[in-house]
C-alpha cells in the first residue's frame, strides 16, 4: 500500500498572509472613518488630511497637517480632542471582528 502526500504549506501561508493584509486594510479604512467622525471641523482641512497606511504587522491612522498635534493633544489651556487615539482604542472589538472575518475567508 502506497500513500502520496502533497505539501500545501506554502499555499496556506500565502493565503493567510493575503488574508492578514486584507484584514489590516479593512481595519485601516474603518479606523480612518472613525477618526474623521471624531475630528472637529473648522475648514475641513484636518479631517480631509486623515489617512491610513498598513504594513505587514499593523494599520496606522494619521495626518500630516502641521497643527494636528495641537488638536489631538491640546495646547495653551485647550483640551485635546484625542480623535486619533480614540479611533484606535474605542473600537477594538470591531477591529478584531474585521480581522477574524478576513482570516475566516482566507
Predicted segments — roles?
Residues 1-106:
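Short, Lys/Arg-rich flexible segments
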